[in-house]
Every structure is written in C-alpha cells, then in structure tokens.
Amino acid sequence: MNNLKEAIKQAEHIVFLTGAGVSVPSGIPDYRSKNGLYAGMSSPEYMLSHTCLVREPEKFYQFVTENMYYPDAVPNTIHRKMAEIEADKNVTVITQNIDGLHEKAGSKKVVNFHGSLYHCYCQKCGRSVSASDYLQSDIHADCGGVVRPDVVLYEEAISESAIDQSLAAIREADLIVIVGTSFRVSPFCNLTDYRNKKARIFAVNKERISLPYPFEMIENDAVKVFAEI
C-alpha cells in the first residue's frame, strides 16, 4: 500500500481502471459472484442483450428497471478518494461500471466504457430522455418511440468515442491502477497493451489478477487500501 501511495504522489498522469468491485461497497451487486446479479438466473446475458431489447422490449425494460438501477446508492471511499486525487493530479477514470458513482463523487474526467444507466435516449427520434422519466416508462412521451439506456448490451460494440478517449489517457499515463475487477473482459482488459512502457501498473483486488507484463499486486479490500492512501 505504501508503494501505491508513493507512486500516486510521484505520478503526473494517472489512469484508474475500475470494475464492479468498486461499487459493491455502495450496495450495488457485481455480476458473477455467488451473491451477484446473475446468481440463480438461467439466462441473464439474454436479458441484457440487444436481441432481447429488440424482440422483447417489455421484458428487457422490466429486467433493467428492477435489477440494474440503484438511484439511492452513494459513492464510497474508493470513488471519493479518486475524485480527491484529481484535485492535484491529471486523473482519468475509465470504468466498466454503469452506475454513475464516479461522477457523483466529483470525478470530472470519467470514461464510461460500457455507457451509463443515467444517460437514456429514444431509439425512434434520438432525443435524450432523463433516467427518472425512463424509470416511469420506456415509451417516449413525445414520439411514442422506445427509450433505452445508453449502455453497451451483449451483441453491441463499445463506442469509438470511449475507445479513443481511453487509449489517449492510457498512452499518456505514467501510473495505471486497476481496481475492483478481474480484468478478463475484452476489450477493457486490452487497454493496458497500449500503455507507455515506462508506466507503472498496480492492481488492487480481493483476488489476484493475471497480466502478461510486470505489475504490483495488492491483494486486499480496495476500500481499506484507498482509505489509507
């Protein structure tokens, strides 16, 4: 932990790569753990697929609104500390999470790699729709089109904008910190392939992750680690 604290002090350009484990302490379940969102479900990937959205929009809407939204969740120590570090450093947060908690914590440079539940739009007219309106109905009041959250579903591609912003930040970073993710989902896990080779890499996760190049592993609860930074 002391090594990470010192690395953050010395770094000028920091990238945090965050996953579901960052939001679990805020009461938002991860996906695949024994207590995760998918536990006991027979076809959760289908429910969050483009096919389901197109073929069974009512079923998609019910699943998303009943299982994905946690509007009362608040940022935890990890989110807050990352935002705090941004006050003194050039920090970019690239997150797999779609819950908006990094922004709630005050982080300004956030790349929502898989989109955000709190950005919604009508598929018919393209206009933005508030998340609060979407939670009331998935039918756009203005044109009758079907509204969806701007998140990356199964069978959909990551946006070019998210990839471009991520690669620009990764290439500039002299410190990369992977937090709360097994770092196995592509293309998110491939981002570090484009790093500056002089950049230091740390990983903070309860379970050890594997990378094909040198990095420093902190196998611990990220809340405890960030509380001491």
Curated annotation (Swiss-Prot):
Active site, renumbered: 114
Keywords, alphabetical: Cytoplasm, NAD, Transferase
Pfam families, per database record: SIR2
Binding site for nicotinamide: 98-99
Subcellular compartments: Cytoplasm
One Gene Ontology CC term in the entry: cytoplasm
Domain of life the protein comes from: Bacteria
Disulfide bonds: none
Function, as annotated: NAD-dependent protein deacetylase which modulates the activities of several enzymes which are inactive in their acetylated form.
NCBIfam families according to UniProt: PRK00481.1-1 (NF001752)
Protein name: NAD-dependent protein deacetylase
